[in-house]
Amino acid sequence: MARRRLPDRPPNGIGAGERPRLVPRPINVQDSVNRLTKPFRVPYKNTHIPPAAGRIATGSDNIVGGRSLRKRSATVCYSGLDINADEAEYNSQDISFSQLTKRRKDALSAQRLAKDPTRLSHIQYTLRRSFTVPIKGYVQRHSLPLTLGMKKKITPEPRPLHDPTDEFAIVLYDPSVDGEMIVHDTSMDNKEEESKKMIKSTQEKDNINKEKNSQEERPTQRIGRHPALMTNGVRNKPLRELLGDSENSAENKKKFASVPVVIDPKLAKILRPHQVEGVRFLYRCVTGLVMKDYLEAEAFNTSSEDPLKSDEKALTESQKTEQNNRGAYGCIMADEMGLGKTLQCIALMWTLLRQGPQGKRLIDKCIIVCPSSLVNNWANELIKWLGPNTLTPLAVDGKKSSMGGGNTTVSQAIHAWAQAQGRNIVKPVLIISYETLRRNVDQLKNCNVGLMLADEGHRLKNGDSLTFTALDSISCPRRVILSGTPIQNDLSEYFALLSFSNPGLLGSRAEFRKNFENPILRGRDADATDKEITKGEAQLQKLSTIVSKFIIRRTNDILAKYLPCKYEHVIFVNLKPLQNELYNKLIKSREVKKVVKGVGGSQPLRAIGILKKLCNHPNLLNFEDEFDDEDDLELPDDYNMPGSKARDVQTKYSAKFSILERFLHKIKTESDDKIVLISNYTQTLDLIEKMCRYKHYSAVRLDGTMSINKRQKLVDRFNDPEGQEFIFLLSSKAGGCGINLIGANRLILMDPDWNPAADQQALARVWRDGQKKDCFIYRFISTGTIEEKIFQRQSMKMSLSSCVVDAKEDVERLFSSDNLRQLFQKNENTICETHETYHCKRCNAQGKQLKRAPAMLYGDATTWNHLNHDALEKTNDHLLKNEHHYNDISFAFQYISH
């Protein structure tokens, strides 16, 4: 069968297969000229209808000569259709019905005008009216002025993001109770500064131009000047007036009623009552509600103290106070370790990023500054509490970032984060270490940061440090400091923290030292007079009244409801005979004598470090450098000198290592507990690690040599219940802050630190959220040595901290400043020198406790249980009960959480 041949080209509308016309048809010029020259004729002129006019061919007309013709379209004649009513009377036989129905009936027909004469005026009014867009059924339902330019955005009335009337809703801000919120907009301040700079620069340019023009002989007229009137005398409106005000201008902004702010329900379900209270406090501080109440109270107190004071002076002082504290929307979260400061700050940050009293978010960006070891921990916490893919942070740990791939440098990532605005902000939270931020702070210039969280904020204790200066230069009015120990050494450090979070709150540094620091310290001294004590207490009360509005402090006692019991012990250890002999030789050496006499060139810190190392183990010393005559030392014959190749550690020459060896053996053989061993010296960790290898104990170690990326993996491996490692060696300097080691329920701190905050941070690693077992914590202190002097100094600092932060005014004045200078004296005839300084009335002369304290206060060891060597047998800890058979422990303080 032959196949049908398809056409070589498709049909083009002219005909199937017909070639289209290639040459256009010529224009008939003559026809166009005739049409244009022809006189105009009114198409609807009133004329009489002729007898044959207007007739339309009917069906009968289509029959000619007995045959039917092809039907044609009806022929219509328009002449005579527009007639008067009088002329419309004619014989119905002459005009068919179809002619009557084809009469003109539009708006201009004479027939309709004859029926309604008022129609003409309506037509004229319609033609003269201004043109409008012919939209059928359009009704203007708004009162906005119709101006040139883009269509204005209609701002809807704000509404709360979450239902405040829900049964489990946690309302942070209620406008009916808290009043209107004064939001400090830093972006407007920057715009004002930029506009001032632009105005100043333009004025300078104008002055330069005027000087140039004055020097010329013929002054030229300024070109491009905006004339006040147009040529017709009408005022020449500027373009801004023609286009209307900007929708972001202050005059054009609509003032809506504030709406409640509610915590996200997914966070409200997991927050504990004390954490809800903390989030409320943080929100009121960073939104200015607390500052507003404080300024109102200050103004009221100023007027009520001296009614006769002139109004101008009172107004000046009030304005000065308000100016100093304008925009200082910060606070200090000083909860003790383990109370969930991280979760509370995440709830605050998430609320500010999502909600506000006007229905939109209050902040666009947030910076979290923390130690380098906690950068990844913060990122994990965000995912843990908010859920995956909810909020993507930019975590910068100093070497690489999570932005822009592997080729992006840290500086480029921070710069890109700072430049992002509006919808380009895909990672609103920057998590960065203190060191990295200090090096790259220039990248954050002109960047408006809504909130700054300074974790472990006691790093800002020095107001003159580079870290403090770098963070203070960032444009951020809302600053929150997280620190479990705000007072570490003195009130000056406390002032530095408050001046960072709330600049101007306590005046200048000199004013703070004069008004608060000096009177309080004089009153706290054991040798203070009654007048100094009274003045110190008055200033302490005044300081506490001010700072209590901007600092929140809760103790670990709250955790008793949620965590297992904690048993904390301060173990006073007797030195071994070899340690005692070497210690006496060191304190009698020429180096130590120079330190005691204050001779120039002496090194007190070096001498203190040598004595502290000896208290741990003699192998930590270098005998050649640290003893005057090494040959006079009477060392045992079997003693292995430092640097020997012996595989074992001679624990019998160190009391601390002897106790540690017995502790580890009991834990390994009688329980499934895990233990954390912490020291300030990596050399001590080396000896412990050597002992663990010899005993075949599986252990992991975290110190300053480990990279930041590997630390969190190591912590996760140790916390795994199925893991084989039961010993975690930790350097207090490298990982004492923020690391959660809840896989272990026992902890030993081998040596004390001068700073009580460092020890408190280290001791809080195991008793935290997620802990399932009872915790046992031990602090080793060598009896009668420099370590006990350090512990006494810590007690004085903790006493100072409790007075200012915890508002405990009844802490006993324990030590004189002169007693703390006697560091290099060893007390041979004591079981616990610290206990003797307490003058404890609950114990007899042998140190046996006769009655317990009414209540135990964690920061006050005078209220703890006091255990002499015989009392160890009755403790509920099987490790300490076993030590009753040995003479290494002379005394112990015991704290029980609940």
UniProtKB/Swiss-Prot annotation:
Gene Ontology MF terms: ATP binding; ATP hydrolysis activity; DNA binding; DNA translocase activity; helicase activity; metal ion binding
Pfam families named among the record's database cross-references: Helicase_C, Rad54_N, SNF2-rel_dom
Every Helicase ATP-binding domain range: 322-504
Induction remarks: Expression increases in late G1 phase compared to other phases of the cell cycle.
Documented EC number(s): 3.6.4.12
Stated role: Plays an essential role in homologous recombination (HR) which is a major pathway for repairing DNA double-strand breaks (DSBs), single-stranded DNA (ssDNA) gaps, and stalled or collapsed replication forks. Acts as a molecular motor during the homology search and guides RAD51 ssDNA along a donor dsDNA thereby changing the homology search from the diffusion-based mechanism to a motor-guided mechanism. Also plays an essential role in RAD51-mediated synaptic complex formation which consists of three strands encased in a protein filament formed once homology is recognized.
Residue ranges occupied by any Helicase C-terminal domain in the UniProt entry: 659-812
Localisation per UniProt entry: Nucleus
Region Disordered, annotated ranges: 1-22, 188-238, 302-321
Subunit structure: Homohexamer. Interacts with RAD51; RAD51-ssDNA filaments do not interact autonomously with dsDNA but do so robustly in the presence of RAD54.
UniProt source species: Saccharomyces cerevisiae (strain ATCC 204508 / S288c) (Baker's yeast)
Tree of life domain: Eukaryota
Residues bound to ATP: 335-342
Protein name (database record): DNA repair and recombination protein RAD54
Motif extent (DEGH box): 455-458
Protein family per UniProt: Belongs to the SNF2/RAD54 helicase family.
GO biological process: chromatin remodeling; DNA geometric change; double-strand break repair via synthesis-dependent strand annealing; heteroduplex formation; reciprocal meiotic recombination; telomere maintenance via recombination
EC class: hydrolase
GO cellular component, one term: cytoplasm
Short motif (Nuclear localization signal): ranges: 21-25, 41-45
Catalysis: reaction(s): ATP + H2O = ADP + phosphate + H(+)
Residue ranges with Basic and acidic residues bias: 188-220, 306-315
Keywords: ATP-binding, DNA damage, DNA repair, DNA-binding, Helicase, Hydrolase, Metal-binding, Nucleotide-binding, Nucleus, Phosphoprotein, Zinc
PROSITE patterns: HELICASE_ATP_BIND_1, HELICASE_CTER
